[in-house]
């Protein structure tokens, strides 16, 4: 496998809640999520949840090729739950969660799964890149975040509005009409976006956390083809550098309203050789 991986926490000394890893023919990326300052009922934390779930999903998808990625994810969610339900109260609304992107190469096709607002970029040899993104969280967020976007990022007023927004968002997590994300309940895996693509049609596959897609979907400074070109020339490190440069130019979120001035950013770029 020809894979390049780059990941950077939101703050240099901060904990990175993203997780990405590869095994022969399989790649996964997870972006841990929680509600800042809220009681979670879990003593382990978001980074533990995303990395533990990611590691289990990688091993399950590798060891059980006959099971679909959605089935592998459900199995992995149940396994993580069994690891800490005896010591943690998983009934809390703000229990740790994570987005999930997973791909697995078979003999002729690439199977994929996307759950939550991380993205999968499929580069077709003849048609260019196609992004697979679960828009349900974004759609729900747009209905709720108006007061947040009107305030300077990092201000006390913004922090208060953001807390209210996140509380409202949590109430719609893993519910019909809301959005779906990996958490304590395995049935969320049934709601993932899934599909297959002929391997011979693809030149590369890229897994991206939403902190790494900001140039496209938040800032509007690049297209998906341009993002693919950056990955091809400078790799994930250059893509993340450009994201950080844009964030630094708008620290208070006046130009690009957002919940956090900086976010964990991860990109896994897998070049599929002909």
Identify the residue ranges that each predicted region occupies.
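PP2C/PPM-type serine/threonine phosphatase catalytic domain
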Residues: 1-274
């Amino acid at each position: 496998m020809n894979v390049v991986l780059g990941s950077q926490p939101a703050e240099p000394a901060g904990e990175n809640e993203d997780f990405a890893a590869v095994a022969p023919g399989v790649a996964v990326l997870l972006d841990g999520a929680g509600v800042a300052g809220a009681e979670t009922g879990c003593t382990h934390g978001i980074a533990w949840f995303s990395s533990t779930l990611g590691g289990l999903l990688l091993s399950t998808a590798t060891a059980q090729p006959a099971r679909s990625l959605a089935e592998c994810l459900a199995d992995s969610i149940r396994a993580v739950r069994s690891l800490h339900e005896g010591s943690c109260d998983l009934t809390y609304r703000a229990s740790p969660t994570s987005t999930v992107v997973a791909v697995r190469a078979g003999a002729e096709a690439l199977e994929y799964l996307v759950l939550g607002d991380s993205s999968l970029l499929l580069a077709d040899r003849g048609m260019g890149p196609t992004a697979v993104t679960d828009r349900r969280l974004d759609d729900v967020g747009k209905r709720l975040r108006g007061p947040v976007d009107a305030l300077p990022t990092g201000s006390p007023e913004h922090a208060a509005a953001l807390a209210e927004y996140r509380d409202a968002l949590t109430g719609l997590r893993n519910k019909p009409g809301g959005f779906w994300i990996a958490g304590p309940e395995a049935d969320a895996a049934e709601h993932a976006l899934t599909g297959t693509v002929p391997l011979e049609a693809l030149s590369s596959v890229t897994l991206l956390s939403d902190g790494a897609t900001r140039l496209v979907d938040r800032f509007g400074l690049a297209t998906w083809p341009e993002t693919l070109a950056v990955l091809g020339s400078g790799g994930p490190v250059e893509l993340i550098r450009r994201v950080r440069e844009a964030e630094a130019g708008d620290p208070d979120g006046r130009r690009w309203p957002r919940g956090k001035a900086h976010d964990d950013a991860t990109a896994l770029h897998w070049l599929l050789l002909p």
